[in-house]
From Swiss-Prot:
E.C. no: 2.1.2.1
Source organism, top-level taxon: Bacteria
Taxonomic lineage: Bacteria, Bacillati, Actinomycetota, Actinomycetes, Mycobacteriales
Site (Plays an important role in substrate specificity): 234
GO annotations of cellular component type: cytosol
Pfam families to which the protein is assigned, alphabetical: SHMT (PF00464)
UniProt pathway: One-carbon metabolism; tetrahydrofolate interconversion; Amino-acid biosynthesis; glycine biosynthesis; glycine from L-serine: step 1/1
Record-given protein name: Serine hydroxymethyltransferase
GO molecular function, one term: glycine hydroxymethyltransferase activity
The gene coding this protein: glyA
Any one GO biological process: glycine biosynthetic process from serine
Amino acid sequence: MTQTTASVNTQSLGELDPELAAAMAGELARERDTLEMIASENFVPRAVLQAQGSVLTNKYAEGYPGRRYYGGCENVDVVENLARERAKELFGAEFANVQPHSGAQANAAVLMSLMDPGDRLLGLDLAHGGHLTHGMRLNFSGKLYEVHSYGVSKEDHRVDMDEVRTIALGAKPKVIVAGWSAYPRHQDFAAFRAIADEVGAYLWVDMAHFAGLVAAGLHPSPVPYADVVSSTVHKTLGGPRSGLILAKQEFAKKINSAVFPGQQGGPLMHAIAAKAVAFKIAGTEEFRDRQQRTLSGAKILAERLTGADVADKGISVLTGGTDVHLVLVDLRNSQLDGQQGEDLLHEIGITVNRNAVPFDPRPPMVTSGLRIGTAALATRGFGDAEFTEVADIIATALAGGSDAETLRGRVRALAQRVPLYQGLEDWHLLG
């Protein structure tokens, strides 16, 4: 029995579980050989992979540094304190909780800390770019709270702050949420703050998508305006799949209690270590350069997708451009629906996701739009030349201007020109 246990404990993944190892090898090959343009995805640095695959996964640590419910937490206390302090410094926040396992759990904790069941919540309509946790009826947020929604105008597809104010004055919400899952423009945090103050509401900003841009100083920061800010640590931040809450100090105790024991038990210390690494990287000039390329790439993509060949096919860019890392493509007047557009690009080696557009006539599993992001390719090393090439490939594909095999060859050449995870040998994951 002892020999069997020792053998299992010391075997590599490839030796112990070849089926799983093969699936992981396939994913590594997919990421290397295709172009990842799902706006919520990114590639983590090697150091983040190392932190997540460390012995910290072994340690239970319910509670917070200095106030744990388990012994032996002296090292994980150091880890969590590093992550908290780095997050506060990076975003200029008074308080940080780095324990949420995901963005959705961070959002649940925010709402638990600020609201009681039945209280009123005002957020961006899911169909207009909001997130599930901002009041979607099947989500906990839609079931626990009385939800009111604002949207975008039919004319320019931008949030109308006069409408937000009108709805807020009528609904008198306890919490107003700004932030989005699919919206290509900056939001006016000062205007949201003024409306929240006028109606006596808390202001919560979900910056999951644009946190990396904020960290780099390339997007207006919500931190000076919001009572509470939540985020994921992946997406533009490029860290592990996980959540983060920032707040003014007066909300610290309630937020800590809402995370633990309100939403979670033991924190994932290996993930918190990976967050600490990501926050350190996000303070570097290299990271800022990456965010510059992310923005530049999105603008190049938006400009190409407004070209005559694309417009002639009834395809347009929502709001006419972008301020962030993503472009929303409107297919309502074209021969394509969102599912067909996603499949067409997948066939040539570009991964995007179909996405509803405001006032979408099609069902959510089909949609009339595409959400295309540039963060992962910027992390990979793409600059303006590469983004110009991939933008032309996408535009040509959607407009039907070339055959799939030719376009797949262009994608393959780009992937080879800017290789992914060089030096990260397969044994690191599979050996």
